[in-house]
Amino acid sequence: MIKQIGTVAVYVEDQQKAKQFWTEKVGFDIAADHPMGPEASWLEVAPKGAETRLVIYPKAMMKGSEQMKASIVFECEDIFGTYEKMKTNGVEFLGEPNQMEWGTFVQFKDEDGNVFLLKE
């Protein structure tokens, strides 16, 4: 099952400007910085020692980004088992777990239509 809130995504116009804000002005450390193409990276920042991180994600890489809100990512150790258990319990998923370079993900909805991400 879910073990913790892993990340909260914040969608930004300028990833480098946001990176400077969170690291230089707020004082967060860079927890991850992996290239995702020529213009962006998978960027996580967090207070020193924190387990939950902010993902600073460029809006330009998201379709419909003008309507994007901050999102929560729940981490688990067995995404396929967790997916099956939650699905059996009546949770609505928006697809099946998808393996990507930086982890395996699947989206699900709560009963009010809020969308969350599950990650292994």
Swiss-Prot record:
Disulfide bonds: none annotated. Signal peptide: none annotated. Residues 4-120 form the VOC domain. SUPFAM superfamilies: Glyoxalase/Bleomycin resistance protein/Dihydroxybiphenyl dioxygenase. InterPro entries: Glyas_Bleomycin-R_OHBP_Dase, Glyas_Fos-R_dOase_dom, VOC. It comes from the Bacteria. Gene3D superfamilies: 2,3-Dihydroxybiphenyl 1,2-Dioxygenase, domain 1. Pfam families: Glyoxalase. This is Uncharacterized protein YetH.
